[in-house]
Amino acid sequence: MSSLYIKTPLHALSAGPDSHANSSYYDNLLLPSFSNLSSNISRNNITTDNNINSASPRKYSFHSLNVSPILSPISLANEILGKKSNTAPASPHHMDYNPISSLTPGNSPEFNKASLSQISFTNPLNYGSGLGFSSNSQPRLPLLDRLSSVSLSKRPERPQQSLPSLRHLQLLPSPLLQENAARFPDTSKRTSNWKTDLTHWCKDTNYQDYVKIREEVAHFKPLSIPNLTNNQNNDSFNYGKELESTRSSKFHSPSKESFDRTKLIPSILEAKDQFKDLSNNAWSITPPVTPPMSPPTNRTMERTTLRGVEASFFEGKSSNNDSIFNPIISEKLVQEVKHQRQLRGNSFPMPNASHKKTNSFKALQIKKLLANRDILSNNSKSNVRKPSKNKISKQASNVFGNTARQLVMKLDNASYSSVSASSSPSPSTPTKSGKMRSRSSSPVRPKAYTPSPRSPNYHRFALDSPPQSPRRSSNSSITKKGSRRSSGSSPTRHTTRVCVSCHSSDSPCWRPSWSPRKQDQLCNSCGLRYKKTHTRCLNDLCRKIPTKGEINIMKSNGIDKEFVPERNCEIEGYRCLFCNYITETVEN
């Protein structure tokens, strides 16, 4: 056998041109395992000389690592180590790929070389006893000197059963039908002794994994969470007691306090209640402080520091000393704010001093009206007094007690009963005492048009309408003669503009229409549509201006002709979608 390895070169192992296709690129580096040689020799019962002549192609299997390969003797080993051309190339991509003998980290050539120092050679020699090998005639392998010296004894390993996978559990689509749940305690119904069931099941299935789990759990200290399992069902609690009593003789079950301190795993069949064991107290240690309350004293701070944080978080009943969190503002604070506002309002001497700045039109007009209240009546100058700094007059307090609208209505009724007819539109009017009182011209008092023959000597304040511009108010006639003169000389310009299409009189702006007359205008909406489409209905009762979408529908219906009596001619155009009359489109 030794002469076989010495005299046979590397190229003799190939059996023709087909041997390269059946072997991988590293077959020249590794020799077949000794078990394959012994099995082939014992099965064929041929001699060593016949083995030299038989050159059949060999298929080497590198997937099994249980049997160690036998290295070549010194001559062949030196030939392998001496020739650099026989070494494997840097990249195997240029060689033919064989999926059967693919490289893995476990079956690489480097791994097989390193495994020689860890596997004993006593067992493989027993397989080669038929070839005349013995422990004394074992050749000396030079590659062992180059490897690290490790003990050649291997401890026999007992095959361990791996834990079954959870893929066999049919969790979806119906979690209620769990046929395999009894085999896996971690997916079964939650009980008080789920931890013991899981640990014992791991111990019976795989003892080494159970030892690892036990070592890891020994360093873990569960959090002390009291009163977490108080609301459990009595059935599950009794069931846990029975199982602990039955297994106490065989296993060392932990105490009940350790179960109470650990959180229970949520079951698949029963969803976890997210609102369970929540407290009504605040999560902050110190209670919130509102302005009516006093800040926490030293006694309350000592009480909060001595109290356990975990007890305050998970207690079902709040103690009497703790203040319950209330998000609503206290009534005492509301009354205090009202009182402070009343004191602040009474302390101001002027009535408009406490009025805040506002952009409201009504509020500004009321403020101006109250500031000029001395000219609202004929005898107001002698009766109205300026309020003192410390005390407000009785009349001013009565005015502020009523609303603004009631104040204006009362002033209007009083003025109609006491007003006198004026024959001239002079700015000054005589009073009963014969004295002339000059009317102060105020730019903030707008003038409204009153067609009544009698005009009061003060302006009626319009609360709901904005003030007119000075240009428009100057055009309006104040007296009877002025109105007659204006009506006799020129027509009134107070004509209401109406849209010629939709007959609307309210529009933010007016746009030109198809009519050459300037009075015929369109509102903003109709003007924008006519600017885009340039189409209008010729029916005087309709005059609808279509939109762009309506124009497309009208175009799909086709062009039609119709005689229009107003124009005394036949017009060609589209049909109106609203009245089915002919329309006119003006080209730009």
From Swiss-Prot:
* Domain of life assignment: Eukaryota
Residues bearing Phosphoserine? 56, 465
Q: Where is the composition biased (Polar residues)?
A: 99-109
Say where the protein is mainly found: nucleus
- Composition-biased stretches (Basic residues): 383-392
Cellular component terms (Gene Ontology): cellular bud; nucleus; Rpd3L complex; Rpd3L-Expanded complex
Q: Which UniProt keywords apply?
A: Chromatin regulator, DNA-binding, Metal-binding, Nucleus, Phosphoprotein, Repressor, Transcription, Transcription regulation, Zinc, Zinc-finger
Report residue spans for region: Disordered. 85-109, 377-398, 417-495
* An individual GO BP term: chromatin organization
| Compartments it resides in | Nucleus
In terms of Pfam families, this protein maps to: GATA (PF00320)
**First and last residues of each zinc finger (GATA-type):** 499-526
Bias (Low complexity) ranges: 417-433, 470-493
- What sections of the protein cross the membrane? none
State one molecular function term (GO): cis-regulatory region sequence-specific DNA binding
Recite the other comments.
Answer: The ASH1 mRNA is transported to the daughter cell before cytokinesis where translation produces the protein to block mating-type switching. The ASH1 mRNA 3'-UTR and the mRNA localization machinery that are essential to restrict accumulation to the bud. Present with 1800 molecules/cell in log phase SD medium.
Q: How does it assemble?
A: Component of the RPD3C(L) complex composed of at least ASH1, CTI6, DEP1, PHO23, RPD3, RXT2, RXT3, SAP30, SDS3, SIN3, UME1 and UME6.
Q: What does this protein do?
A: Component of the RPD3C(L) histone deacetylase complex (HDAC). Responsible for the deacetylation of lysine residues on the N-terminal part of the core histones (H2A, H2B, H3 and H4). Histone deacetylation gives a tag for epigenetic repression and plays an important role in transcriptional regulation, cell cycle progression and developmental events. ASH1 is necessary to repress HO in daughter cells to block mating-type switching through its binding to HO promoter 5'-YTGAT-3' sites. Also involved in pseudohyphal growth.
Protein's name according to its UniProt entry:
Transcriptional regulatory protein ASH1
Q: Which organism is it from?
A: Saccharomyces cerevisiae (strain ATCC 204508 / S288c)
Q: Which gene encodes it?
A: ASH1
